[in-house]
Structures are given as structure tokens and as C-alpha cells.
Design a protein with these regions (language model features):
Chain B
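Ubiquitin-like/PB1-type beta-grasp interaction modules and other compact soluble beta-rich domains
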Residues: 1-78
Length: 140, 80, 140, 80
């Protein structure tokens, strides 16, 4: 579908190329969510993050979420880019971009996509601290 | 039947491998698979939760497993 | 304040430089809203838009909105860039960017800022159609 | 006192100028100013609404106008 762009990549994500792809003369509002690797979790310094994905299923689940966004809101284009591999503090694990004729739909769909991605897409993040590594959310 | 189970994230560490092989009866369900795995790898029960995917789709406990299905253990996801 | 960047400019807005400014090692989520000039209003082709601002008051009102965002949500940086002058279809009249440790605050503050900007900041837009020009929202 | 009133957007077209001068009594309020302007430029009353700003702040109808205040007519805004 040329109104959807899903990418799972071990290379740096490029915000500008996402913006270039999402903009169109039909759209009036674009909402972009950019996740970044924070330097601390609950006050504890983070050294780096490792992202692992079950790649074919992750792409399939991201496509489902994009499809749901089109069903729920009058949006024009949906972009989801996610990184894999090792990311340093300040790097970008995820970019979501949504264009729509009106901003309500763009904001709501963008929010829905990142919230749902964090619940359903098989990607796992391991945080490296000075005293060891932890798979995020694995244990109660 | 013999099936291969893919493991990701913390499950890979619990299994000590990204792929384990199991012997299942022909009418085995996801429920049966989880029971067997938890017998063999008790640390699975310490996870906040985990799902099983069959052919890239989340499966329900009652779903039947077929030979050649691609089975994967999905510990709590944490992307984004 | 070095956590706030307000710009009113007759030059093209640059999304990448906004992203570069808003990103920081303390932030985990960034929400960016980009307004674009749509090629039609209620099905009628739009040729161009002219933006006029009461500049000192527009800047002062944008600063107030940024300040309110800091009071209402735990956000780290707020950026508001707005164009003046003549814009063609596809050009960008406004960019809002908000960074926060957690995405909830970034999304809610970004939405609040664009909604409030459209209600209070003294900037006016004139749409040029094939059969004439109209000041948007001027008349009931 | 003589005051200058800045006009923007559609108000500039109604006034035929971006600045008009008015003679007001010394204790004049925003309400008085709007009444005078609407007498002189009846098309102001056809606007969806309009505000008056004094020294870059939105003013209330009862606010008093002082000599040298920067007064501006703010028709419905439509930025963003």
C-alpha cells in the first residue's frame, strides 16, 4: 500500500526522510512521535539499549496496527519505523508519523499506534546499566 | 510430532538457545505446549506473562498445533 | 529560557532543525505537530495562503502558551515556530515540538499548544481561491 | 486624548488602513472604543467577533484606555 510505510531496520532512523514521505498536498496536519533512548530509568543511568525483534511477526503486527488506524480515523498516510540492534543514549528506536486532512485524526491515530505497538509488536528491549542488563517488563 | 520453538528476549536466555525442539502428540494445543515447556524450563513461570505465536499470529490456549507450524515464545514485549 | 524556542518568521520553517533542537538525552518521547497548507478547503481548490501576524503580541501569546504547557505537564522543552507571508500548497505554516521523559506529557502538551495557538495567537490567514480571497473565520 | 488603533487581517480591510486615529475622552473604556469604531465602521459588527488588545494583552470591555497605550483590533484569529 502506498499510503503505509513500515520499516524495521538495524540502521539509524532518519526523521527528515520520514517527514518527506508523510507530507502531501492533501494533508493539513501531521503528527510525528519520536522515541529516544533516555539516559536514565527510574533515576538509574542507562548505558545503552539492545532491541531484538521477531522480524516477520513484528512487521505483520505493525501492518495490522496501521490498518486499524485507517479503519478508526480518516487518516491519509501512516509511517512506522522501528530500530533493532544496539542503540546509544539519544538515538531513536521508533518514529511514528500520521498525516490527515485535520489534526484531530492525526493526533489520535499517532497516539493509538505507539500505544498499541508497545502492547502487541514482538520487539524486546534490554537495558544496560553499570551493574548489569535487564529485559524490560519481563518480570512482575 | 517434533516441533521447533523459537525464543526471543528473556525466553532465549531461559532456554539457553534461540530454538528448542520438543516432541508433542499430534493433537497438542498451545496449553499442552506451555505445560511441557514450563516443566522443562520452570523460570518461564516467573515471567510477568508470555504468549505463544503460531505462524506469526498470537495463538489462544485451545489452538491446536500442526506439524511444520512456526511456533514462537513471546515474552512481554517492550518495543517503542 | 533555554527550554523554550519561539520563532515567528517569513522564511521557510525547517523541520530537521526543530527536531535537532528538541532532542536531548533526558527525553524519552517527542511529539511534533506539523501544519501544512492543504490544496483544498471544503472541496474548493486553494491556490495559496497569506499569513499576517501582530508580531510582538503573537510572540508574547506563544510564550504564554509554552509557559502554560510547562505548568500543566512534566515536559522538558517546547518549540513553536510559525510562518508569516505567502505560503504555497504543501508549505509549512506551523511546527510545534514537545519533549518529555514520558510520551503522555509530550502528546498532551503538543495537542494543547496547537489547539490554544489557534484560539489566542494574533495571526490571520487569508485563503486565495480561483474566484477570490477570504480571511479565514472572520465572518459567522 | 487622541489614540491610534492598529488593525490586522479583515479589520485592516474594513478600516481601509492598518492604523486609524480616534479622539477619546480621558476615562474611555474598551467598551466606549468599540462603540465609536462600530459607528464609524459598521462592517465591524458583521465579524464573527473581535477583541481589542492593549499593550499586547487582550483587554476586557471595562478596561480603561490611557494615552500612549498601544491599541489593536484583533478579528477572529486563524493561525496554525
Amino acid at each position: 500500500m502506498n499510503n503505509t510505510q513500515i520499516v524495521l531496520s538495524s540502521e539509524s532512523l532518519n526523521v527528515q526522510s520520514c517527514i518527506d514521505w508523510i507530507m502531501s498536498p492533501e494533508s493539513g496536519g501531521i503528527d510525528v512521535f519520536i522515541g529516544t533512548v533516555r539516559n536514565a530509568t527510574k533515576g538509574k543511568p542507562v548505558l545503552k539499549l539492545d532491541f531484538e525483534a521477531y522480524e516477520p511477526m513484528a512487521i505483520s503486527e505493525m501492518e495490522k496496527i496501521a490498518q486499524q488506524a485507517f479503519e478508526k480515523w480518516p487518516v491519509q498516510k501512516v509511517l512506522i519505523h522501528h530500530r533493532t540492534g544496539t542503540l546509544q543514549v539519544g538515538e531513536v528506536p521508533v518514529i511514528i508519523a500520521v498525516s490527515a486532512a485535520h489534526r484531530d485524526a492525526a493526533f489520535e491515530a499517532c497516539r493509538y499506534i505507539i500505544d498499541t505497538l508497545k502492547q502487541t509488536v514482538p520487539i524486546w528491549k534490554k537495558e544496560a546499566f553499570e551493574d548489569g542488563e535487564v529485559w524490560v517488563a519481563a518480570h512482575p | 510430532m517434533k516441533i521447533n520453538v523459537l525464543a526471543f528476549g528473556v525466553a532465549k536466555e531461559i532456554f539457553g538457545s534461540s530454538l528448542v525442539s520438543l516432541e508433542l502428540t499430534n493433537d497438542a494445543t498451545i496449553y499442552n505446549l506451555k505445560y511441557l515447556l514450563e516443566q522443562q524450563y520452570p523460570r518461564l513461570k516467573q515471567l510477568a506473562s508470555y504468549m505463544v505465536a503460531v505462524n506469526n499470529e498470537y495463538a489462544l490456549p485451545g489452538d491446536t498445533i500442526h506439524e511444520r507450524d512456526e511456533i514462537a515464545i513471546i515474552p512481554p514485549v517492550s518495543g517503542g
